[in-house]
Structures are given as structure tokens and as C-alpha cells.
Amino acid sequence: MKKTLFTALCCLIYIVADAQTAHSLFWKKDSLQVAEIVSKVGNQFNKVGHHGPAVENSHMALRIYFNDSGAIDVYSKPAKGMELLEYLWYPHKKGPVGVGDGNDHYIVGKTIGLGGIALWDCSKEVKLVATKGRTARAGATKKGSYIEMIAYGVEYMSGFVDISIRIDMDSRSREAKVTARELSGRKVRFLTGVNFHDGQSVFTGKGYIGVWGPHKGDKSPVPVPLGAGLRFRQSDFTPVQKTEDLMRIISKPSSKITTSIIASSVIEEELNTEQLFREYFK
């Protein structure tokens, strides 16, 4: 009897822990959750639910835009409960946003957002323009949940490449792992980083980039300061460069890179000040 109760308790603990991630992917036309969306057209941004596959952990939700941008966007959360499958990224569409609800305060604009991916051709940024179709995937893993977006037939350096962006969320961590790959194994130069707006604090250190402050264009009645950060292996990238709206890093020639991203905000309980967010990286 004791052994049975112990086994049941262990199963319950596993279920609770595993419930701290979620994923979502669907066409707007039917709102049915699916594991994969395949499109012969490169840009179906406005036809896919929340504009692309989305994944959530206890501290944030992320989505990959289903278009040429390669951008990753952020949904900020005040509490550790799951919200993605209930609100589908937009709590205000279900009524007034409650005290415990998160919201879409992050503004990507025309950038790659937080840890999104583009390519670099030695002189300029190359967006993931899919000439041979685009695929999105979402599902569960042993440790949590994942989403993926694949752009097929991206014109690059006098040829074509197929680029995958995958985000893995582990139920035991507040960070998410971003993996970018060229599917045939061809070496390319990946571009990633963290976007920023006028008035935000920007800081860098050994293997990390951080940004703190409200986002220009956030329509909230009271601006919500956000934290956005990226960790990376310095030996894989050139030094951090600052443009007018992006703290970017460019990889050395490689068929695959991995980074970790994190987001926070003043509405959460842990990393809710700029000082705490900065200290997290030290």
C-alpha cells in the first residue's frame, strides 16, 4: 500500500512539473491545435494563430513569427501559472486583463526581436525569405515543450539554404534554448541578438547581452519595463555590435548555433527590477 501511494505521489509530482510548459500552433480558420503547419507560401503571418508557433514556461511565453523576419517575440507574465492555451497570446480578447494575467508588452518592430535569427553575407543582414515554403512545428519533449520554424529555399551567397529556428523550454529553467541550423549541414553565418528602444538600458558582459526598460509603442496605460537577455558562447561569435535598434552578434561560419534567452518584467515576483535583472547575468 505504501509503495502504491509513493508511486502515485511520484507520478503526481512529475505531472505537475511537466505542466510548467505549454505549446500552441493552429490555423486561424479552424483554431484546431496541430503539431505541424506546412505552407507552400513563405508568408502566412496573418493566417496562423498568434502569428506563428508559441511556447510557454513558468516565466514567459515566446513565439516565432511565421514570416521572413526570423523574429522571436515575448509575452510577459506576472505569475507562474500557464496562460498560453487559455488566452492564445491575447488576454484582452477574453475581456479586461486581470491582475494575474500577462500581456504582450514586447515590441519587435522590424527587428529579429529577442534571440531571433537572420543570416549575414559579410556585408548585410539576410532575412529568411522562404522561396520554397515554410513549416512550423510544436510539441512536447522529455523536459518540456518546443516550437520550430523552418524556412526553405533562402537565397544566400549565390545559393539556397534551408534554415531551422527551434526554441526548447525546460520545465525546470526560466531560460529557453534557441537552436539555429542549416539543414543540409552547409556552413553559414548566423545573425542574432536583442533589439532595444530609445530610453532603454543596454548592457553586455562575458557571453551575454541584456536590455531593460519599457518598449516604444507599448499601448499599455502605464509603460511596463521589461528585461530581455541572451547568453552565448563567445568563441562562436564576433564581438557584440550595436546598431540603431539591435545589439547583435554574428556567428563564425557554422551549420548550427545555440543560445539561451530570458525575459522578465516589473509585473513578476523575481527579476522585477533592472538591478536584479543585471545581477542575474553575473
Language model features with spans:
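Aromatic sugar-binding interfaces of carbohydrate-active proteins
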Residues: N195, S201-P221
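Beta-strand-rich recognition/accessory modules
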Residues: L226-K282
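Extended, loop-rich substrate-binding clefts of extracytoplasmic carbohydrate-active enzymes
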Residues: G102-S171
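Short, exposed beta-strand/loop patches in secreted or surface proteins that constitute
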Residues: N46, P53-V55, K132-K142, S201-V202
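A short, structured loop/turn motif at beta-sheet edges
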Residues: R137-K143, S171-R172, E182-R189, S251-K256
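Solvent-exposed N-terminal domain segments of exported/luminal and surface proteins
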Residues: T21-L128
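Bacterial Sec-dependent N-terminal signal peptides
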Residues: M1-T21
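Acidic (Asp/Glu-rich), glycine- and aromatic
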Residues: I163, E175-G205
